[in-house]
Regions:
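Active-site acidic/histidine clusters and adjacent loop/turn architecture
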Residues: 79-140
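Catalytic phosphate/metal-binding cores of nucleic-acid and nucleotide-processing enzymes, i.e., regions
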Residues: 16, 29-35, 54, 126-129, ...
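Intrinsically disordered, low-complexity Ser/Thr-rich linker and spacer segments
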Residues: 4, 68-84
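Catalytic cores and adjacent binding grooves of peptidoglycan-active enzymes
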Residues: 161-170, 174-250
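Second-shell loop/turn segments in exported
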Residues: 3-12, 29-34, 54-57, 109-123, ...
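Short acidic, glycine/serine/threonine-rich helix-capping segments at coil-helix boundaries
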Residues: 7-72
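Surface-exposed patches in mature extracellular/periplasmic domains of secreted proteins
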Residues: 32-33, 56-58, 139-149, 201-217
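Active-site-adjacent substructure of cysteine-protease-like catalytic cores
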Residues: 135-137, 143-165
Length: 250
């Protein structure tokens, strides 16, 4: 049964629940485990309240809510051209190399996992479009992706060692308005991070497992870095990585 073909509610289980949890990653957010529990219900409440502007959100995903999810995706599209790796050598999303290989001498945790994942994770993409929504509502200029996928070839060109941008992360910024200075960008990005912590349940830093993360302002003062590197490997399975809008919203 295709996503959207049946009503979803608390206690439901299955792949359609996983897809729902991913699409609502930026509305509070929960684990994409296929179990429609209280966390998923709160996601639906948040979407119905904040985007659909329902006076009495019910946490039940009927045809009306499915239609709103489609409208939301169309209103806040993801520009995959801005995400593709710029190395000129890979497909735009790495070469799926180094699975299970970690930086020498470092702990075997995702921060040091050298794998080039086969796309960008759905949770971070859906969280990005939700960030666009909340930031627009707060009066920000339109959010733009400034850094997406960066494979090892691109890393070597720029003398980088980070693995976050191999499918698990996006960097986002906002264009300066007329008369603004870079310090205004610092203030705006701080406010944006605050919105994402409040509305999308991001954590600042990587202290807790299975949480979406933001780089703190001392690392990313004039942009917002968001990633999913703190998740267990089962939540980073290949099926959660996509390379196009068609795959993201299928």
């Amino acid at each position: 049964m295709a996503f959207g073909d049946k009503t979803l509610k608390r206690s439901d289980k299955g792949k359609d629940v996983i897809e729902l949890q991913l699409r609502l990653s930026g509305f509070r957010g929960t684990l994409w485990d296929g179990d429609f529990g209280p966390g998923t219900e709160l996601q639906v409440f948040a979407f119905q309240r904040d985007y659909m502007e329902m006076k009495k959100p019910n946490g039940i995903v009927t045809a009306k809510t499915f239609a709103a999810l489609g409208k939301f995706a169309a209103e806040f599209p993801v520009d995959f051209a801005s995400i593709r790796c710029r190395c000129g050598k890979c497909s735009g999303f790495g070469q799926d190399r180094f699975n299970g290989q970690y930086k020498v001498g470092m702990p075997k945790v995702e921060a040091f996992h050298r794998r080039e994942y086969p796309g960008v994770h759905k949770a971070i993409l859906h969280s990005y479009r939700t960030a666009k929504f909340y930031c627009q509502r707060a009066g920000f200029p339109p959010a733009q992706i400034t850094s997406g996928y960066r494979c090892w070839v691109d890393n070597q060109k720029h003398k980088r060692e980070s693995t976050n941008h191999m499918g698990k992360a996006l960097d986002v910024d906002f264009p300066l308005l007329a008369g603004e200075l870079k310090r205004d960008d610092v203030v705006r990005c701080d406010k944006g991070r605050g919105l994402l912590v409040e509305k999308s349940s991001f954590q600042t830093g990587w202290g807790a497992s299975n949480r979406k993360s933001l780089e703190p302002s001392d690392i990313a003062p004039t942009w917002i870095h968001m990633d999913v590197r703190s998740y267990e490997l089962k939540y980073l399975a290949d099926e959660y990585f996509v390379t196009s809008s068609e795959e993201l919203d299928a």
